[in-house]
Amino acid sequence: MTQPEARSTLPADYESQLRESHLRPLWMANVSAVMRAEPGQPLRRAQPHMWHWREVRERLLRAGELVDVAQAERRVLILINPGHTSPDGVSADSSLFVGAQLVLPGEVTSRHRHSAAATRFVVEGSSAVTVVNGERLAMEPGDLILTPPHHWHEHVNEGTEHVIWLDMLDAPISSHLDAVYFEGSPRTPVSEQLPERQAYRAPGLVPYRSPSATPLRYPMLRYRWADVQKALEALASSADRAQAVHLMYANPETGASVLEPYGYSARLLRPSEEVAPMLTSASAVYHVVSGQGESEVGGRTFSWEQGDVIAVPSQTKVRHRNGSASRAAYLLQVDNAPLQSKLGWYREFA
């Protein structure tokens, strides 16, 4: 949908009075066109786009040579959607901050907490740990690590290899709502994983408790890729070929998303398989965990390989195809469907 050009027919002195009073005519504002947008034809800034991991990785490693982690706080390159032209535009799609972070051997990032909800998806390296509220969490490639709002966290690389992961935060949302805060703190003693979290390792089972007891709000902070891949492969081997292999990361106590306001899920594409997810009002970001293939997003075709990141704007048709005839491909999907659902905005289109 093309936004109509607003033309002023108002007297100059009246326009001046409106500006002085910090008022604006609705019929002259961009919001007027937005309110007339038709379903399936939204006015949106985000564009279909793909970040090639080989480029991101090369530039991130270069940053490791140029920037000390003590100087940078976090050595992160932000993935910015080309549709966001303002200096403060930091979204990979319409609402999700995605950044690639590098931690070199021996580095320790400063301990802090903030209002934004954050996750880390490990791309390279196995020698780092994330410490959340004093609890030590191992990080292996493909693992999803949660750092919920208001939780203290830091990262430590204890090995001899660099570690890279994707940071994913709701910072664009909290920033827009003026709900951002950040607080630093000295390091504190670190403990191993809380014993009660071990009880959540078996699917469909949670610790027995009195009906009056309150469960952990975030019972799992680390979702191991080894477990996710095993579950995807089990579904692929038993499901009908017509059924897509798609599993959601869920809070075992509630069945809801592991960390709202976003939904996290993993897809397995069978050899040569092609899938066309339902067209919805949600925007999404895909990360290629492994494999190679192509995705058609809003009429554009992106050929992808391991590590690449793809932005799918709201109400945009998408189709994925596994380019291998012998090996499965795996995709991580992060979308804002839970947020839209909470606000009553979410829609599905035939």
Protein language model regions, located:
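A short, N-terminal "cap"/entry segment at the start of jelly-roll beta-barrel domains
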Residues: 2-94, 183-184, 190-261, 265, ...
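A short beta-strand-loop-beta hairpin characteristic of the jelly-roll/cupin
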Residues: 104, 108-141, 147-151, 278-306, ...
